[in-house]
Amino acid sequence: MRASTHSWLLLVVVLSLSSFTVNAVILEGLIPPRSHLAPSTFQQPFALSSYLQKLFGTSLRALYGAEQNRQTSVKTFGLREAYHQGIGDKAHERARATFDFRITANDVQADQANIDFIPAIRTVRQRITRAKDPKKYVEVRGQSYRDAMCAASTELDWEDVDVEAPDVTERTTVLAFAKMASAAYKNDTSDWDGIGGFDPTNSFGWEGDGIRGHIFTTHDNDTIVVALKGTSNVFLGGGDTARRDKTNDNLLFSCCCARVSWSWSTVCDCYQGHGDQCGQTCVERALIEKSLYYPAITDLFNNVSYAYPDSQIWITGHSLGGALSSLLGMTFGVPTVTFQAPGERMAAMRLHLPLPPAKHADESPVAALPIVHVYNNADPIATGTCNGAASVCSNFGYAMESKCHSGKSIVYDTVGKLGWSMTINAHRINTLVDDVLTEDWSEKVRKKKAKLRSIGSRGGQISTRGWRWPWHRGDSADDDGDSDEDTDEDDKLAVPKARSEERCQDCTNWHFTDETL
């Protein structure tokens, strides 16, 4: 509204100034007289807009609003194919399936609740700082701790590039990515073909020894989205990679080798006793050398970029797939949107992934990464509260202790605004798609408030329970610097504002005895 008012005022100014001659402007001393101008310059028609631009500087652009400078466009995607990348001793085994746009967004009138419908994606121009040659970095770091330290100490060349990125302020864009992330769970292997001599039909159990990425493309392959499959954990229905995912989840997201209590079988031997002491270098080495997913996802990314050399790549994923997507986005500097992902910043630090240099002293390079995490705060995994000996995660052998995300996070306050209870079912991608993203957040909040008012008018009992960010320490503002009043602004938006979690801290109850990086 304010920008619109300014635009009308500016139009009045323009019309008023138009009644003056150029000579009148010269007499006021606003532009040099004719004798001070080159003849060729003075002969050009006087552009009042250029003159106003000089007067107002960049403020003229602000008066018209940012929308005119967003350079938005719309893209539609369909499911083109899927890749399966083996890991560990089966890293050479790959498979591919072609789907020929089986899931598509061609019909703009399609039912958005239909799982096979993907809404169009709106894009914006975004400047990203990324390594000039990330593939060389990945090649140098190898799979040993020593190689990773060598790569981390190597000075990288960085570049600023303007790219098309998904406009996550648009609900339908967020919904489209969520549906693509959901499609990555489809486990029909009837269409898979082996690559490099690998025959899926004669390799029992191959689905449980790798990662999967579904490839969505525009019709001209100008842009592709890689959707990585997330965790097939047993308490959410199990799946063909549940055993492998559990081991890697515990390596990636636990504070110290999944050492929840003395009765646990840990995934590494870094616990040093005294209740809360752990070896920092030890857990870094264990994650780099024992976790098989990071080298596998970089291999998958390289294979996809080789198959689509002229396409820009975006990445998405849910749960573990979202965390792995974020690690890829950090490594290769590509736009990434994740859903209900556990905090992956600690894993990125332990893996010693490269961070671009900060542009300003007060700017966080972690917050500037082209990564956006989307989750609702009723999910104990995404909020980092599914831990402790009595938690659901612990009961099934998962030590989901990390909570801090890189980039920025869009957090739907389903607990405070919609009255949801904290439950593991809120971690499901279908819960987010069906119960949150089908309409604008502002509309959902409005309907909930109207329902509460209706109950109150009939004499019913209303429970209003406040909720704060899970890493809140009791201050008057959240640890990320946003007050409760700031987050209430989300109630008026189609999608909550993306905010940094840079002040979040993981594993504050642990003491790491080596130097902490």
Curated annotation (Swiss-Prot):
* Annotated PROSITE patterns: LIPASE_SER
Provide a GO CC annotation, any one: multivesicular body membrane
Q: What is its main location?
A: membrane
The chain's Cytoplasmic topological domains, given as residue ranges, are: 1-6
One Pfam family in the UniProt entry: Lipase_3
Q: Which residues lie on this side of the membrane: Lumenal?
A: 28-517
**Catalytic machinery residues:** 319
Q: Which UniProt keywords apply?
A: Autophagy, Endosome, Glycoprotein, Hydrolase, Lipid degradation, Lipid metabolism, Membrane, Signal-anchor, Transmembrane, Transmembrane helix
Subcellular localization is given as: Endosome, Multivesicular body membrane; Prevacuolar compartment membrane
**GO BP, one annotated term:** vacuolar protein processing
Q: Could you give a GO molecular-function term held by this entry?
A: phospholipase activity
Q: Which SUPFAM superfamilies match?
A: alpha/beta-Hydrolases
User: Compositional bias (Acidic residues) at which positions?
Assistant: 477-491
Give me the glycosylation sites of this protein.
187, 221, 303
Q: What does this protein do?
A: Lipase which is essential for lysis of subvacuolar cytoplasm to vacuole targeted bodies and intravacuolar autophagic bodies. Involved in the lysis of intravacuolar multivesicular body (MVB) vesicles. The intravacuolar membrane disintegration by ATG15 is critical to life span extension.
Q: How does it assemble?
A: Binds to both phosphatidylinositol (PI) and phosphatidylinositol 3,5-bisphosphate (PIP2).
Name this protein carries in UniProt: Putative lipase ATG15
Organism equals: Mycosarcoma maydis (Corn smut fungus)
